[in-house]
Curated annotation (Swiss-Prot):
Protein name (record): Acetyl-coenzyme A carboxylase carboxyl transferase subunit beta, chloroplastic
Organism: Liriodendron tulipifera (Tuliptree)
Keywords: ATP-binding, Chloroplast, Fatty acid biosynthesis, Fatty acid metabolism, Lipid biosynthesis, Lipid metabolism, Metal-binding, Nucleotide-binding, Plastid, Transferase, Zinc, Zinc-finger
Organismal lineage: Eukaryota, Viridiplantae, Streptophyta, Embryophyta, Tracheophyta
Binding site for Zn(2+): 228, 231, 247, 250
UniProt-listed Enzyme Commission number(s): 2.1.3.15
Residue intervals of the CoA carboxyltransferase N-terminal domain: 224-488
């Protein structure tokens, strides 16, 4: 006999994610922690407590923290015991064996006793109930047993929590009328859906995150929510921009568009873009089997509203005139082609002639392969312009490395700043993890290319969060002799 602890929640097939229940579920409560294979339940082990529902009479979406749809809860192996606890603290051991038609409950309860009596009646009489929700095919013994279990629980919960019939999916199959959602704390699950759901639990069971099937739901509601790629928490999209694309749950810095970064750094009304009409002409006539290079450029222009993977211009930062270039990873991975290199070079030359400080915000996968050696020469061209700017004119260049900064950008102007600033958690490398592992046939340790690791190796200067970045830049400029045009 194998025992499992379940964090069981009821959800409808139509509302299987984040639904609220309209009535207090006094008879049905929340289970508790993982038994770790022990035969004796540890009811009061707070370290293994997952979640509890409040005793209030109504429930909103916030009361149901985790839903993970499972199409067939009876696909678990037979001869199982699962343990539940109601809102009054009473615990029950429920055992059912589908093959031998056994259903037992170890404690007297109105909810579970009614279920047990229903099953006993079914076993003794071999006939289905008159309830309209029990209308299942009874010709196959195993099929009818499975569906009778489902329909009994379905019917009881309908009456207990006052769920109207219109919520039902309308299917004639009882097993489709409701979906019982389980988050299992066991080491393995036998079932058809268990393989498609990647569930991770921490040591105390308080942080359970489903990754696989949740992505489809998140895509459906991506106009409302932004999912953190670190903790998988959801952030309300309407307020996400005002939070500087920082996850409210874990503080992780998510990617920002170039326009959002300009709005974050530049004083309102002072932004003056440069070379906006400069576009690539496909210099080597690169054509792939999937999509021609020109067509790909056009599609990214429509998608992002940008002409290229970098925006350059002049503006003011806390009243200090600056020249700034911001790369956008959403445009072909921020790859550096001839247009990107030319725009950055012109920006540096303009700043050299006007004696302006330069900021470059890097977010790139490296040189653009569709332009061949012309993209590689941009590294030398930008570095040459920076040499004149820094060494001859003695001006101040700040490089800001965001996630990801790799390839040719890392090998050129990304690492040439007088001050090199990195964002928290930024992925910074010359060759990416996948490229290194495929080339050298060696495993790259996790975190070895993160900003925090590189910082301790002396690769750059400070790690600055976004909410402090503008103030830090302002102090750096004033320290190097660049002051606001108007004193407050």
């Amino acid at each position: 006999m194998e025992k499992w602890w379940f964090n069981s929640m009821l959800s409808n097939e139509e509302l299987e994610h984040r639904c609220g229940l309209s009535k207090s579920m006094d008879s049905l409560g929340c289970p508790i922690g993982n038994t770790s294979g022990s035969e004796d339940p540890i009811i009061n082990d707070t370290d293994k407590n997952i979640h509890s529902w409040n005793d209030s009479g109504s429930y909103s979406c916030s009361n149901v923290d985790h839903f993970l749809g499972v199409r067939d809860i009876w696909s678990f192996i037979s001869d199982e015991t699962f343990l539940v606890r109601d809102s009054n603290g009473n615990s029950y051991s429920v055992y059912f064996d589908i093959e031998n038609h056994i259903f037992e409950i170890d404690n007297d309860s109105s909810f579970l006793s009614e279920l047990e009596s229903s099953f006993s009646s079914y076993l003794n009489n071999g006939s289905k109930s008159d309830n309209r929700y029990y209308d299942c095919d009874m010709y196959d013994t195993k099929y009818s047993w499975n569906n009778h279990i489902n329909s009994c629980i379905d019917s009881y919960l309908r009456s207990e929590i006052s769920i109207d019939s219109y919520i039902s999916s309308g299917s004639d199959n009882c097993s489709d009328s409701y979906i019982y959602s389980y988050i299992c704390s066991g080491e393995s699950i036998s079932g058809s859906d268990s393989g498609s759901s990647n569930i991770r639990t921490d040591g105390n069971g308080s942080d359970i995150r489903g990754r696989s099937n949740d992505f489809d739901i998140n895509q459906k509601y991506r106009h409302l929510w932004v999912q953190c790629e670190n903790c998988y928490g959801l952030n309300y999209k309407k307020f996400f921009k005002s939070k500087m694309n920082i996850c409210e749950q874990c503080g992780y810095h998510l990617k920002m568009s170039s326009s959002d970064r300009i709005e974050l750094s530049i004083d309102p009304g002072t932004w003056d873009p440069m070379d906006e009409d400069m576009v690539s002409i496909d210099p080597i006539e690169f054509h792939s089997e999937e999509e021609p290079y020109r067509d790909r450029i056009d599609s990214y222009q429509r998608k992002t509203g940008l002409t290229e993977a970098v925006q350059t211009g002049i503006g003011q930062l806390n009243g200090i005139p600056i020249a700034i270039g911001v790369m956008d990873f959403e445009f072909m991975g921020g790859s550096m082609g001839s247009v990107v290199g030319e725009k950055i070079t012109r920006l540096i030359e303009y700043a050299t002639n006007r004696s302006l400080p330069v900021i470059m915000v890097c977010a790139s996968g490296g040189a653009r392969m569709q332009e061949g050696s012309l993209s590689l020469m941009q590294m030398a061209k930008i570095s040459s312009a920076l040499y004149d700017y820094q060494s001859n004119k003695k001006l101040f260049y700040v490089s800001i490395l965001t996630s990801p900064t790799t390839g040719g950008v890392t090998a050129s102007f990304g690492m040439l700043g007088d001050i090199i600033i990195a964002e928290p958690n930024a992925y910074i490398a010359f060759a990416g993890k996948r490229v290194i592992e495929q080339t050298l046939n060696k495993t790259v340790p996790d975190g070895s290319q993160a900003a925090e690791y590189s910082f301790h190796k002396g690769l750059f200067d400070p790690i600055v969060p976004r909410n402090l970045l503008k103030g830090v830049l302002s102090e750096l400029f004033q320290l190097h002799g660049f002051f606001p045009l108007t004193q407050n």
